[in-house]
């Protein structure tokens, strides 16, 4: 284990584990995602840390439930993280 550590060039894995405010460049942990309904295959945009129950527009199926942090997706729902 080396005693000298490069603070200006941390590894991406190490940087991702840090708190969002203590990173070299601050970035949020939250993101938007496209969630596909398992029943009608419609795509809905959902926030990763949603605080309310999100329903499908087409068939009113519950897509995700809020928890203390990230929203929990319902079984069978597939998602894709949106690019900014």
From Swiss-Prot:
Disordered: annotated span: 1-23
UniProt disease annotation: Diamond-Blackfan anemia 17: A form of Diamond-Blackfan anemia, a congenital non-regenerative hypoplastic anemia that usually presents early in infancy. Diamond-Blackfan anemia is characterized by a moderate to severe macrocytic anemia, erythroblastopenia, and an increased risk of malignancy. 30 to 40% of Diamond-Blackfan anemia patients present with short stature and congenital anomalies, the most frequent being craniofacial (Pierre-Robin syndrome and cleft palate), thumb and urogenital anomalies.
* Family annotation (SUPFAM superfamilies): Zn-binding ribosomal proteins
Q: In which tissues is it expressed?
A: Expressed in a wide variety of actively proliferating cells and tumor tissues.
Q: What does this protein do?
A: Component of the small ribosomal subunit. The ribosome is a large ribonucleoprotein complex responsible for the synthesis of proteins in the cell. Required for proper rRNA processing and maturation of 18S rRNAs. Part of the small subunit (SSU) processome, first precursor of the small eukaryotic ribosomal subunit.
The subcellular localization recorded is: Cytoplasm; Nucleus, Nucleolus
Q: What is a single molecular function from GO for this protein?
A: DNA binding
According to the UniProt record, list the residues that bear Phosphoserine.
11
Sequence intervals crossing the membrane: none
- InterPro entries attached to this UniProt entry: Ribosomal_eS27, Ribosomal_eS27_Zn-bd_dom_sf, Ribosomal_zn-bd
Please list the residues that bind Zn(2+): 37, 40, 56, 59
Zinc finger (C4-type) positions are 37-59
Biological source species: Homo sapiens
* Top-rank taxon, per record: Eukaryota
The record describes how the cofactor is bound as: Binds 1 zinc ion per subunit.
Q: What is its main location?
A: cytoplasm
| Protein's gene | RPS27
Q: How does it assemble?
A: Component of the small ribosomal subunit. Part of the small subunit (SSU) processome, composed of more than 70 proteins and the RNA chaperone small nucleolar RNA (snoRNA) U3.
- The secretion signal range is none
Q: Its GO CC terms?
A: cytosol; cytosolic ribosome; cytosolic small ribosomal subunit; GABA-ergic synapse; glutamatergic synapse; nucleolus; nucleoplasm; nucleus
Q: Name one GO biological process term.
A: ribosomal small subunit biogenesis
- Give residue spans, biased composition: Basic and acidic residues: 1-16
Q: Which family does it belong to?
A: Belongs to the eukaryotic ribosomal protein eS27 family.
Official protein name in the record: Small ribosomal subunit protein eS27
UniProt keywords (A-Z) are: Cytoplasm, Diamond-Blackfan anemia, Metal-binding, Nucleus, Phosphoprotein, Ribonucleoprotein, Ribosomal protein, Zinc, Zinc-finger
Cofactor dependence is on: Zn(2+)
């Amino acid at each position: 284990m080396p005693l000298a550590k490069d603070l200006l060039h941390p590894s991406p894995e190490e940087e991702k584990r840090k708190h969002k405010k203590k990173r070299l460049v601050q970035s949020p942990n939250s993101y938007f995602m496209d969630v596909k309904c398992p029943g009608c295959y419609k795509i809905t945009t959902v926030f990763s840390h949603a605080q309310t129950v999100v329903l499908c527009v087409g068939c009113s199926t519950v897509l995700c439930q809020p928890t203390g942090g990230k929203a929990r997706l319902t079984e069978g729902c597939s998602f894709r993280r949106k690019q900014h």
